[in-house]
């Protein structure tokens, strides 16, 4: 209710809302919250890591989001190591297949410590094989407020590394975007 009140008070300055992490699809009340955003006349962008394909399917089936950005952390075989948690890769794959059917989406990968060119190749090959290769955003890692505190000691990803990864990704994706600070 606090969030909705704040948004309502600032409607003159807003045209949309971004729903982001933790992982918003883990909240069972998310569809109802989004309906309230639409009642305010706002567009909705959802940021997700793809770990709850069932909720993602419901949101897209009911046309409750205008844009989906799904993070893919790394190649599938390294997910547990890179995320420092156990991840159900089949859920990620199901989510990819759901998102690709939606007209307004992008996949994103943050070039964080431990991410390699091999990750880009494997992600690119997989998404292309699933016809889910419309847009990839290559994002700059920025230390600060990292869930994994051990990452705080690393510098932000250099622009030259971002460009190298983006150039590699262009072999697999229709469009590659580089996002820096």
Feature-to-residue mapping (PLM):
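Conserved AdoMet/S-adenosylmethionine-binding subsite of the radical SAM
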Residues: 2-16, 25-162
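A C-terminal junction/extension of Radical SAM enzymes
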Residues: 163-181
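Short, charge-patterned binding micro-sites
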Residues: 22
């Amino acid at each position: 209710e606090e969030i909705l009140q704040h948004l309502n008070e600032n409607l003159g300055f807003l045209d949309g809302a971004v729903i982001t992490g933790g992982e918003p699809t883990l909240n069972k009340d998310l569809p109802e919250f989004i309906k309230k955003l639409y009642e305010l006349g706002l567009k909705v962008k959802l940021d997700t890591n793809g770990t709850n394909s069932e909720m993602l399917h419901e949101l897209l089936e009911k046309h409750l989001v205008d844009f989906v950005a799904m993070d893919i952390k790394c190649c599938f075989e390294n997910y547990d190591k890179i995320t420092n948690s156990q991840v159900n890769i089949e859920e990620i794959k199901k989510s990819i297949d759901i998102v690709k059917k939606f007209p307004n989406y992008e996949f994103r990968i943050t070039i964080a410590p431990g991410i390699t060119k091999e990750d880009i190749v494997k992600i690119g090959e997989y998404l292309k094989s699933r016809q889910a290769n419309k847009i990839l955003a290559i994002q700059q890692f920025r230390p600060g407020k990292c869930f994994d505190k051990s990452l705080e000691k690393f510098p932000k990803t250099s622009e030259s590394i971002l460009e190298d990864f983006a150039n590699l990704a262009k072999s697999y994706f229709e469009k590659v975007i580089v996002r820096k600070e």
